[in-house]
Amino acid sequence: MPHKDNLLESPVGKSVTATIAYHSGPALPTSPIAGVTTLQDCTQQAVAVTDIRPSVSSFTLDGNGFQVVKHTSAVGSPPYDHSSWTDPVVRKEVYDPEIIELAKSLTGAKKVMILLASSRNVPFKEPELAPPYPMPGKSSSGSKEREAIPANELPTTRAKGFQKGEEEGPVRKPHKDWGPSGAWNTLRNWSQELIDEAGDIIKAGDEAAKLPGGRAKNYQGRRWALYTTWRPLKTVKRDPMAYVDYWTADEEDGVSFWRNPPGVHGTFESDVLLTKANPKHKWYWISDQTPDEVLLMKIMDTESEKDGSEIAGGVHHCSFHLPGTEKEEVRESIETKFIAFW
């Protein structure tokens, strides 16, 4: 649970008022996308969101759970053009390796593997929902069990939003992309390549889980962490990202919405943490974010779970509406979720 006492003072920057759609449940969304975008069963609260300019460098991944860094991608210059950002070959051969090197240089990790690449290039639209039902638990997620997909058919890097008809827009509901249980289940199920890399970690985690206090108290294996990067494809004028300083949130602020993605052993239980309101939350954003300003956010970090740790863990985040920007160009972005090993 976050407990750091020496919180960084808010920098001098613009503070805007945003309406945050905190989860207040219960509801059973019709899909994982609906789970993190529906405004049904939400408590709308006005919050202050502080601009990290001009003190961008004061906020770091280990210090706050998020960081904005300068990084120029080759995809932003000739011979590439705007369409190259959604070209799967360019992404795989040019952009993904750039993110891996950036991740290693920032975190000091020895190994980085990209799990998911996403493109967002349409306006926010709330999905259609079924009537409200109790929030699903692990054993009642409503998804039908599927046969195991052959290991060699499940790539470590999956992609969404790049093909016509699967476009996605901003996510207005605050969340974390994985909860602790879902993160560990992802480690042991996502792809054979990931399982092979993390074999010793999985074993150490299983041993720790058997002891009083579970993995969070007893894990002694290699450090590993999940992150997401967010790069706008043009200067952000609408629907910017907002993120909560890790130390101002409580463990109880996240409510698991369970989902069943495909894995090498069949479908497995994973979760998104939907964010409940907490008056302690301190929200931040960066104004007029440009394509060479990459936002990185932690999703989870085993180092942060140790007793007395001063290493930040995963942060709640979402996009938010800036009044008066309705006629601005639609926000476009590329997201990359990756796992790091030390």
Swiss-Prot record:
Q: Does the keyword Disulfide bond apply?
A: no
- A Gene Ontology MF term for this entry? oxidoreductase activity
The pathway noted for it is: Plant hormone biosynthesis; gibberellin biosynthesis
Q: Region (Disordered) spans which residues?
A: 127-183
Q: Does the keyword Nucleotidyltransferase apply?
A: no
Q: Which domain of life is it from?
A: Eukaryota
Kindly provide the name given to this protein in its UniProt entry.
Answer: Gibberellin cluster GA4 desaturase
Which species is this UniProt entry from?
A: Gibberella fujikuroi (strain CBS 195.34 / IMI 58289 / NRRL A-6831) (Bakanae and foot rot disease fungus)
